[in-house]
């Protein structure tokens, strides 16, 4: 448990430094019919409840923050090259439960403002390299704290195209 907590803390600190991310608090619920609770797979059914002080208006427990993050970036007037990160606690009652899926989701997430001309494969790869560097730094710091957890990741990330995979 201690290692898990340290990995989470180290990684968010490393990534927020690499990608200029600001930590923001995510909502646990949003108002129904605002469009902020993404319908991830077309059949998501949100957990709903009335809010007494709002004339019993209906709120939904979040199951995705994709749209909310973009709205938050706009509200904060986040310039290109900067972004946000958050912890989302969600309920997904439609989830198929197995050894890696639960109806409860504790998900760390981030979003960054980019310019239209940055929507390129080159920029995506540059961002992936920065994320990978954050993972590598986290792995190395974890090794210092827990020497039994040896670093295993290669020095550099390798990109492969789906066509190359088909030819294998």
Show the residue positions of the predicted features.
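Short, surface-exposed, polar/charged, turn-prone segments marking secondary-structure boundaries
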Residues: 88, 112-117, 137-141
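Non-heme Fe(II) oxygenase catalytic core, chiefly the N-lobe of the double-stranded beta-helix
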Residues: 102, 124, 131-135
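Class II aminoacyl-tRNA synthetase-like tRNA-binding/catalytic domains
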Residues: 1-101, 109-113
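Metal-assisted phosphate- and nucleotidyl-transfer catalytic regions
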Residues: 31, 130-168
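Well-ordered alpha/beta subsegment
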Residues: 115-125
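Hydrophobic residues within well-ordered alpha-helices
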Residues: 11, 128-131
């Amino acid at each position: 448990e201690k290692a898990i907590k340290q990995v989470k803390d180290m990684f968010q600190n490393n990534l927020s430094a690499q990608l200029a991310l600001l930590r923001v608090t995510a909502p646990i619920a949003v108002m129904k019919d605002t469009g902020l609770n993404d319908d991830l797979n077309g059949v998501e059914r949100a957990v709903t409840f009335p809010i007494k002080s709002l004339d019993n208006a209906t709120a939904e427990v979040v199951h995705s923050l994709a749209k909310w993050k973009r709205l938050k970036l706009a509200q904060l007037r986040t310039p290109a090259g900067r972004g946000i990160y958050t912890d989302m606690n969600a309920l997904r009652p439609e989830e198929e439960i197995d050894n890696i899926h639960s109806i409860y989701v504790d998900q760390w997430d981030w979003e960054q403002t980019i310019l239209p001309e940055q929507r390129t494969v080159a920029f995506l790869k540059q961002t992936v390299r920065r994320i990978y560097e954050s993972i590598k730094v986290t792995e190395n710091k974890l090794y210092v704290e827990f020497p039994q957890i040896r670093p295993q990741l290669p020095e550099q990330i390798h990109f492969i195209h789906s066509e190359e995979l088909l030819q294998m």
